[in-house]
Amino acid sequence: MRIRPTRRLLLGAVAPLALVPLVACGQASGSESGQQPGLGGCGTSAHGSADAHEKEFRALEKKFDAHPGVYAIDTRDGQEITHRADERFAYGSTFKALQAGAILAQVLRDGREVRRGAEADGMDKVVHYGQDAILPNSPVTEKHVADGMSLRELCDAVVAYSDNTAANLLFDQLGGRRGSTRVLKQLGDHTTSMDRYEQELGSAVPGDPRDTSTPRAFAEDLRAFAVEDGEKAALAPNDREQLNDWMSGSRTGDALIRAGVPKDWKVEDKSGQVKYGTRNDIAVVRPPGRAPIVVSVMSHGDTQDAEPHDELVAEAGLVVADGLK
């Protein structure tokens, strides 16, 4: 279902105000900022006062009784929309898009120098595993226990189908926690904490920094992998295109950011959902005929059994789309 109501219908009594770009709050790790999910860290206008976007996001908090964090950047002109963009949230399966990007960045492709000990056969390298490795929600890997899967196939499975076993196999290929963290630090991300395997990473206990990031950090990582070219690019052009193709094929986010933006805007995304009502989506959004917008929406509730809200993410996407048209 596509969400395209008017703002007044969408957010209730929020009055339409002039749209003013939000200023980033300043990136800091959880240990440096001391922020916990759902506390502070809100975007402000250039004049330091709450603006239309902020009021809309706070209306969403009230409407869904949840805590959303949003970071969006228009790569055309650098305009940002933020709300709790530097607070920590459990990232859930959204990390799988970055995981696929990290794999692409580390294997030999078209004669490029290998960043660290990758096999010469690159993305065609076959990873073998046993039945004991299969986790719930592993619709692709469960069919290939006998023959194994290539890195390319595992990346497709982890992004398009959110395959949990594929995520763990790729985590090992990257060198576990240390290797995954090293790749992100090469992108300039000193915020994200990648710690555990599926399905332990889904605990999402408030205040636990493990397996968390911020909307800003994840959006910046996704931008490096999926959008940037030239010196800022984390991937070669063909690898970047491959990652975007995998995200385009993901259908787990149809009710999220994709549902909130205009129908003719192409969305390449990766969603996530874990405990405490955590519902996330990170996306490259491509309006026709112009540079893309990179969006990260993360959200959580207050109790372990809180309901996740697809509509919250979709409506946050609508606010972003209306603000960055």
From Swiss-Prot:
InterPro entries per UniProt: Beta-lactam/transpept-like (IPR012338), Beta-lactam_cat (IPR045155), Beta-lactam_class-A (IPR000871), Beta-lactam_class-A_AS (IPR023650)
Miscellaneous comment as given in the Swiss-Prot or TrEMBL entry: The class A beta-lactamase family has a specific amino-acid numbering system, sometimes called Ambler or ABL numbering and often misspelt as Amber. A multiple sequence alignment was used to derive a consensus sequence and then the consensus was numbered taking into account insertions and deletions. This allows use of identical numbers, e.g. for active site residues, despite differences in protein length. UniProt always uses natural numbering of residues, hence there appear to be differences in numbering between this entry and some papers.
Cysteines paired by S-S bonds: none
Organism, as annotated: Streptomyces cacaoi
Protein name: Beta-lactamase 1
Protein's UniProt keywords contain Signal: yes
Keywords from the named record: Antibiotic resistance, Hydrolase, Signal
Catalytic residues as annotated in Swiss-Prot or TrEMBL: S93
Class of this enzyme: hydrolase
Signal peptide boundaries: 1-26
Residues engaged in binding substrate: K270, S271, G272
Pfam families xrefs: Beta-lactamase2
GO biological process, one term: response to antibiotic
SUPFAM superfamilies linked: beta-lactamase/transpeptidase-like (SSF56601)
Ranges for region Disordered: 30-50
Name of encoding gene: blaL
Catalysed conversion reaction: a beta-lactam + H2O = a substituted beta-amino acid
Documented EC number(s): 3.5.2.6
Single Gene Ontology MF annotation: beta-lactamase activity
Family classification: Belongs to the class-A beta-lactamase family.
